[in-house]
């Protein structure tokens, strides 16, 4: 098989990375995609870095065995915990990670107050601290860990009253502090944008990094002469959690039905 027609492997702690997969599809419609949801171990945000690294190596090995030509860590927590080790272990493999959009948010804010919704793991990471030091020295950044939100999205409860109540509790303190720019620092959270728009004023910008990750993948594949030129094959999905549940949320999150395999 021509290496440029090989698939790109994408993975996340659960279904959140599908928000990134959606952006990759839009920008790179010829790329065939493989997706692993590690839903049997979700959420990563509450796990140790060592545990997350072990999971990431297992998943990467699986994706390489399926012929992946590149890897997208569609998870902020996994990137913070494991990207450096994966790049060291697989030096020939183009790897794209993700980080909360601190730089664009610091540039966008008018009030000088930026809110960050993320998992505990991302907010505690050295990588996040370094991002704040580098890009947010002139703005006030208020971080808000969001336990429970990932689980709501995994269950497909995007508009449920309980999800709304939880999200409102996380967002209101940020708005009270004058925050006008909200970073969605977890790939699950873009699926809550419709709900968020109903909870925050129109003047508040919501910033996530899915599109930026797709552009970085495009750059890396181009550098390695790996951009696909033929139409994509159907996306293949795996989950380490409840297969039926993932099959049920795919139409909600991506508008498609697909078979999910056991990982």
UniProtKB/Swiss-Prot annotation:
The keyword Acetylation does not apply. Substrate binds at residues 12-13, 44-45, 76-77, 187-188. Its EC number is 5.1.1.3. Signal peptide: none annotated. GO terms for biological process: cell wall organization; peptidoglycan biosynthetic process; regulation of cell shape. One of its GO terms (molecular function) is glutamate racemase activity. The keyword Translocase does not apply. Pathway: Cell wall biogenesis; peptidoglycan biosynthesis. Keywords: Cell shape, Cell wall biogenesis/degradation, Isomerase, Peptidoglycan synthesis. It catalyses: L-glutamate = D-glutamate. It holds the Pfam family Asp_Glu_race. The active site is at 75 (proton donor/acceptor), 186 (proton donor/acceptor). Belongs to the aspartate/glutamate racemases family. HAMAP family: Glu_racemase. Provides the (R)-glutamate required for cell wall biosynthesis. This is Glutamate racemase. It comes from Ectopseudomonas mendocina (strain ymp) (Pseudomonas mendocina).
